Amino acid sequence: MAQLFFRYGAMNSGKSIEILKVAHNYEEQNKSVIILTSGIDNRDGVGIVSSRIGLKREATPIFSDTNIYELVEATNPDAACVLIDESQFLERHHVIEAAKVVDDLNIPVMAFGLKNDFKNELFEGSKYLLLFANKIEEMKTICWFCRKKAIMNLRMNNGLPVYTGEQIQIGGNEAYYPVCRKHYFNPPIQEEIEKEG
């Protein structure tokens, strides 16, 4: 029976590479997949799933007016799986449409994304995935500054931590780091970051 999965993790926890791996495994068995990603994320171009280790793949971009259920039904209602990257950028209606893909088309949907933003608040997509998903799994990584598990995302600008501002900001001079709670509130100064990086 198909289910809606939400796999979340801090920055650098391997979410995008996991999507590429899952897609490869299905396709190696001649099973078709539909890969979706947020149209907001244009770091490597719109409609690209890109991992930090350099692997990339085209995907269908999701915009505010995209209906995920209709998109899947029109693209391939017999797909073996739907994979969604950057799912934190989904809106409530997208998550409900993804759940409908699971319930009405019996296609598993695996959504991958951040749970919380740099202010340590839930993204809209993450909030509704936490509410509607059948299975929720944390993808783990370690803090940029120590060996503890990273559970937060720290935004830095010119060597200083940023705790206010727009939730979604693609590009710019900001850098994001996966961090533990201690280093979220007390990050090392810029010189130490440069030594670590």
Curated annotation (Swiss-Prot):
Carries keyword Nucleotide-binding?
A: yes
Name the reaction it catalyses.
thymidine + ATP = dTMP + ADP + H(+)
Q: Which residues form the active site?
A: 86
Q: Which GO terms describe its cellular component?
A: cytosol
Q: Where in the cell is it found?
A: Cytoplasm
> Which parts of the sequence bind Zn(2+)?
143, 146, 180, 183
Q: Into which EC class is this enzyme placed?
A: transferase
Q: Which UniProt keywords apply?
A: ATP-binding, Cytoplasm, DNA synthesis, Kinase, Metal-binding, Nucleotide-binding, Transferase, Zinc
User: Which GO-annotated molecular functions does the record name?
Assistant: ATP binding; thymidine kinase activity; zinc ion binding
Principal localisation: cytoplasm
Which EC number(s) are documented for this chain? 2.7.1.21
Where does this protein hold ATP?
Answer: 9-16, 85-88
A single GO BP: DNA biosynthetic process
Gene3D superfamilies given in the database record: 3.30.60.20, P-loop containing nucleotide triphosphate hydrolases (3.40.50.300)
> In which domain of life is the source organism classified?
Bacteria
Give the quaternary structure: Homotetramer.
Q: Which family does it belong to?
A: Belongs to the thymidine kinase family.
The record's annotation in HAMAP family points to: Thymidine_kinase (MF_00124)
Matches recorded under NCBIfam families:
PRK04296.1-4, PRK04296.1-5
Q: What is this protein called?
A: Thymidine kinase
Query: Taxonomy-wise, where does this protein's organism fall, top ranks first?
Result: Bacteria, Bacillati, Bacillota, Bacilli, Lactobacillales
Task: Supply the gene name.
Answer: tdk
